[in-house]
Amino acid sequence: MRYIRLCIISLLATLPLAVHASPQPLEQIKLSESQLSGRVGMIEMDLASGRTLTAWRADERFPMMSTFKVVLCGAVLARVDAGDEQLERKIHYRQQDLVDYSPVSEKHLADGMTVGELCAAAITMSDNSAANLLLATVGGPAGLTAFLRQIGDNVTRLDRWETELNEALPGDARDTTTPASMAATLRKLLNSQRLSARSQRQLLQWMVDDRVAGPLIRSVLPAGWFIADKTGASKRGARGIVALLGPNNKAERIVVIYLRDTPASMAERNQQIAGIGAALIEHWQR
C-alpha cells in the first residue's frame, strides 16, 4: 500500500510540470508580440493527418509577401501535371521586365530561363522577376487566386505583382492569407493528390534548397532535422516563413509563422521567428 501511495504521489508531482510545459510555445509567441509591438500569427500542423497542434491568431489575415512563391510554383506544377506547361520550356524576357531584387534572372537576359529554372530562382533565392514571369503563365494574380479557390482555399488571395504585393499596409486585405489557410494549402500541394508524386517531390526539393532563410528557423534547427522552407519580408513591419520540419530528416509537420505591424528591425523580426521555432522544436522533443 505504501508503495502504491508513493507511486501516486510521484505521478501527481509530475502533472504541474506537464501542464506548465504544454503552452510553452504560446508563451514564447506572447513574449514575441510584446517585444515586437506587433502581431504574430502561427500554426503547427501535422502533415499526415492535418491536425492542428499549436495555433495563435491562425485565422487572422497576414501579408504573404514572398511566401506566395511556393503556392505559385505549386500552380505551375499543376499545369505541368495537366500537360499545359513544361518545366523545360524556355522563357525569354527583357531588361524592362526586371524588378527590384532579381539576383538570378538579371544574369540571364541574353539566354532566358526555363520554367523550372524560374521556379528554382523564385523559391531558393526569392527572385522577384522570376516570380512575375511565372505569375504571367498562370493568369496573373487573379489566375493564382482562382487556382487557390479551385483547390479549396477560399481565404488566400493575391492581388498584385512583385514588388507591390509586399506593401503590407495595416488593415489591407490584399495579398494576404491566414496561417491556417496557408498551412492547409501547403498540405494539399505536398501531401495529397492535387499534384503528382513527382511534382510534390520537386516542389519540396525547391524548398529544401532555400538559400535565403538562414537567420530564421534554420538557425535553431537541431542536427539531423529536416527543413524545407520559404520566407517573406516587407519593409513595412512584416515577416513570414512557411516550413516543413521533422526529426530524423523527415518532413512531419507544417509550421507557418507571420509577423505584421511591427516597428522592429529585420534582424529583430528574424530573431523572434527563430525564437518561436526554437520553442516549437523544444516542445516537440519533450
UniProtKB/Swiss-Prot annotation:
In its UniProt record, a GO molecular function of this protein is: beta-lactamase activity
Q: List the disulfide bonds.
A: C73-C119
Cited InterPro entries:
Beta-lactam/transpept-like (IPR012338), Beta-lactam_cat (IPR045155), Beta-lactam_class-A (IPR000871), Beta-lactam_class-A_AS (IPR023650)
Entry keyword set: Antibiotic resistance, Disulfide bond, Hydrolase, Plasmid, Signal
Cleavable signal peptide:
1-21
Q: Which Pfam families is this protein grouped with?
A: Beta-lactamase2
Q: Which GO terms describe its biological process?
A: beta-lactam antibiotic catabolic process; response to antibiotic
**Keyword Cell membrane on entry:** no
- Other remarks? The class A beta-lactamase family has a specific amino-acid numbering system, sometimes called Ambler or ABL numbering and often misspelt as Amber. A multiple sequence alignment was used to derive a consensus sequence and then the consensus was numbered taking into account insertions and deletions. This allows use of identical numbers, e.g. for active site residues, despite differences in protein length. UniProt always uses natural numbering of residues, hence there appear to be differences in numbering between this entry and some papers.
**Which family is this protein grouped under?**
Belongs to the class-A beta-lactamase family.
Q: What is this protein called?
A: Beta-lactamase SHV-46
The organism of origin for this protein: Klebsiella oxytoca
